[in-house]
Amino acid sequence: MSNLFLKRVGFSMVLGMASLQAMAASSDDFVDAATEAGIAEVVTGKLALDKSKDPQIKTFAQQMVTDHTQANQKLGDIARKLDISVPDEAALTEKVKKMILKWRDESFDRSYVNNQVEAHEKAVELFRKEAASSDKAELKAFAGETLPKLEEHLKHAKELQAKHGQ
C-alpha cells in the first residue's frame, strides 16, 4: 500500500468523522456530528496553516479556522441552552491530532484540498437535513444560517481541488 494512500485514508478519517452520523435523526446526533466535524476543521486548518506552502491554501485554512471556531461556539451555546450534551473539545482535538501525527509534507496540499471537498459535501448534507427537519427550532435556525457558509466553503474547496487536488 502506498504512503500516499495511507495518508489519504487517514485524512478522510479525520474529516469524515461525522459521516456515519450525518444520517442520524436526533438533535443530539446532529450536535455530536456537527461538533466533531467542526473541531476537525479547526485542527486540520491550523495544521494546513503550518504545513502548506501555498498562499491560497493558507488563506482557505485560515477561513476554516475562523468560521468553524465561530460556528462551534454558537452550536455549543445553543446545545447548552437546549440541555444537549456537547462532545468534549479537548478529547476530540486529541483524537484528531493522533490521527494526523504521521502526515508528511510531500502531498499535504493535495490531501488537504481533496478531503476538504469530501468533508464539506458531508457537512452540507448534514446541515441541509437538520435545517429541513429538526425538531428543535434553535438547531433548525442554526443549520439554516450556517448552510450558506458551508456551501461557500465547498465551492472554494472545489476550486482549490481543481488546482491542487485529485
Model-predicted regions and their roles:
Residues S2-Q166:
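His/Met- and acidic-residue-enriched segments that coordinate or traffic transition-metal cofactors
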